[in-house]
């Protein structure tokens, strides 16, 4: 899930004519950067067209001290000869992607950070993602038990030079939630936020 902190119309669809956004083809539509601590070691999990891929997890701490656990996938070629151990601090560059996985005869949307580069680092924790895509389901607006405004959207993000899209669930809060709630399916937006893994407990009435 992406928690968004900024949202803007892309002028290819609608919006202020003075906003001067670049077109989808002129910019990357999916950019993510994370600094965190390895909490699960890389292991080879699958192979595609002869190239092996490794999965691992990185823990990223927020200013509030809450922690997000981010699943990461990286190719063996991108990993190279680098070796990592639990507790290593790493800097990751890549994209936030999705794929469907069959679980109990049902398709489940799996989200992961696809790393194109990894390095050891002493930098502070970082969790940034920027997406440009299309709203592909009607936004769902609601209020939390603490009366905070929230809106869920599913964003289709096209991969450049690839006939595939990543479907990314996003959460917006406050004025951003109000802004996006009335937008229609097919609206293109530019978003900026963070990857969020914290599990929420839903409060039910007796």
Which residues are covered by each model-predicted region?
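Single-stranded nucleic acid-binding surfaces, predominantly the OB-fold ssDNA-binding core
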Residues: 4-206
């Amino acid at each position: 899930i992406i928690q968004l902190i900024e949202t803007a119309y892309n002028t290819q669809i609608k919006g202020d004519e003075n906003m001067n956004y670049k077109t989808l083809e002129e910019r990357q539509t999916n950019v993510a950067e994370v600094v965190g601590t390895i909490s699960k070691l890389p292991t080879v999990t699958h192979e595609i067209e002869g190239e092996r891929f490794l999965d691992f997890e990185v823990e990223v701490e927020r200013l509030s001290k809450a922690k997000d656990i981010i699943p990461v996938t990286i190719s063996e070629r991108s990993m190279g000869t680098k070796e990592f151990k639990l507790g290593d601090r790493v800097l990751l560059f890549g994209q936030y992607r999705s794929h469907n996985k069959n679980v109990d005869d049902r398709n489940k949307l799996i989200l992961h950070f696809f790393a194109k580069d990894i390095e050891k680092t002493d930098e502070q924790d970082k969790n940034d993602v920027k997406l440009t895509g299309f709203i592909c389901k009607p936004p769902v607006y609601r209020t939390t038990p603490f009366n905070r405004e929230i809106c869920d959207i599913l964003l289709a993000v096209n991969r450049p030079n690839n006939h595939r899209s990543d479907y990314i669930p996003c959460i917006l809060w406050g004025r951003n939630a109000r802004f996006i709630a009335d937008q229609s399916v097919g609206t293109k937006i530019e978003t900026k936020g963070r990857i969020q893994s914290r599990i929420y407990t839903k409060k039910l009435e007796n």
